[in-house]
Amino acid sequence: MGDWNLLGDTLEEVHIHSTMIGKIWLTILFIFRMLVLGVAAEDVWNDEQSGFICNTEQPGCRNVCYDQAFPISLIRYWVLQVIFVSSPSLVYMGHALYRLRVLEEERQRMKAQLRVELEEVEFEMPRDRRRLEQELCQLEKRKLNKAPLRGTLLCTYVIHIFTRSVVEVGFMIGQYLLYGFHLEPLFKCHGHPCPNIIDCFVSRPTEKTIFLLFMQSIATISLFLNILEIFHLGFKKIKRGLWGKYKLKKEHNEFHANKAKQNVAKYQSTSANSLKRLPSAPDYNLLVEKQTHTAVYPSLNSSSVFQPNPDNHSVNDEKCILDEQETVLSNEISTLSTSCSHFQHISSNNNKDTHKIFGKELNGNQLMEKRETEGKDSKRNYYSRGHRSIPGVAIDGENNMRQSPQTVFSLPANCDWKPRWLRATWGSSTEHENRGSPPKGNLKGQFRKGTVRTLPPSQGDSQSLDIPNTADSLGGLSFEPGLVRTCNNPVCPPNHVVSLTNNLIGRRVPTDLQI
């Protein structure tokens, strides 16, 4: 039985490196084979030769008949079966121990490497030091009691299952050929040196038959476990391969999904930052107000409503706002052009080639050249402010004079304009007209072509204005040609529309007339 103990200790190591079905197989091998052979089978088969009795006195005949009846002792046959069936497991155990030792050496080498890295890491790097300590603790806890069943070790395990299954089948076939499934109590033998057919009797044949069937059943169960373990490993291998492909595909899909989410989040953050940097366009009233103040105070800095922004989107917004302003300006120009056409029709009968400024004749060509020069200078100053202002707004004369009394109006050269509140007439030739009657039909004292006059402030609907015709009065007037713009074009262009300014008020001489 000492040999059984050595074999049992060796198979215990195999038990550690086996699968669940392999452990069941080893349990059956230990309990139902080795234990039965060691405890009960020897007692049953101990009197096998002594209890074999033959009806002859011929020397040697009983031994020849016993050899024919029991060519091999079943107890020894079963011992050989256990040894041969366990031998592939011993080979697998040797390979598993070798792999375990290799893994342990690799673990020790990694531990030594981590300790060296941990010693080299400075205390100023706590994150790296903590990471190395965690890896070292994991290596300490990762001490393997058995080698993982993968790679070449898995191949060895499958081969050893096939081998012991083949051995099991061989011993089962051999036992059947030798003894069958039933042991007869009477055995007839003939042969030399027996003179004739000799009858021999087997001791305890029923008990031996039971043991025979029991050992054959244990062998069948072991074979079934071997086949089941092969299917288990194959199914596990296939499942692992399919799961690996599914997991790889899932990780691939998750990677692309996360990448798409990151791109969307990055695009949203970029769009949000761009929207934060975009300046909001002011409304129309605020824009007109800012540009009006800019025209009134030209010495101040230009409005910063549309100052260039480092972001590229601000340029597009500025262009959009300027387009909107130009659209509004075009509408206003159309309205004013209609009014100018009406006044041009009224004053078409009084057109002349000369311009009269308070009784003084000026050459028309010189005045046109002067106006063009002033218009170019004003355009240059106008576009150099970094933004575009609305050149003019259609303003009702009466309402405008009530809102801003200190305003100088610049009319086109070919547009004679007379406010409704102005009851008086202009020029020395119209002083004898009725001052109380409002203009009806044809305007009295209409502006001549190219005539520009400064409008006095209105004191009421019934109040009129008398402009003396003397030279002193004419000489006392201070006229600002740079601030008054006229147009000689039949269709009033945008740059000759009404402009608002207070420069005249700031530079007025005592003799100037106020509006």
From Swiss-Prot:
**Where, in residue ranges, is this chain on the Cytoplasmic side?**
1-19, 99-166, 231-515
Please give, as recorded in its UniProt entry, the membrane topology of this protein.
Multi-pass membrane protein
Region (Disordered) spans which residues?
Answer: 370-400, 428-472
A GO BP entry: cell-cell signaling
Signal peptide span per the entry?
none
* Location(s), subcellular: Cell membrane; Cell junction, Gap junction
What are the GO cellular component annotations? connexin complex
Q: Which GO terms describe its molecular function?
A: gap junction channel activity
Listed under subunit, the entry gives: A connexon is composed of a hexamer of connexins.
Q: Which family does it belong to?
A: Belongs to the connexin family. Alpha-type (group II) subfamily.
- What is the official name of this protein in its record? Gap junction alpha-9 protein
- Species per Swiss-Prot/TrEMBL record: Homo sapiens
Gene coding for it: GJA9
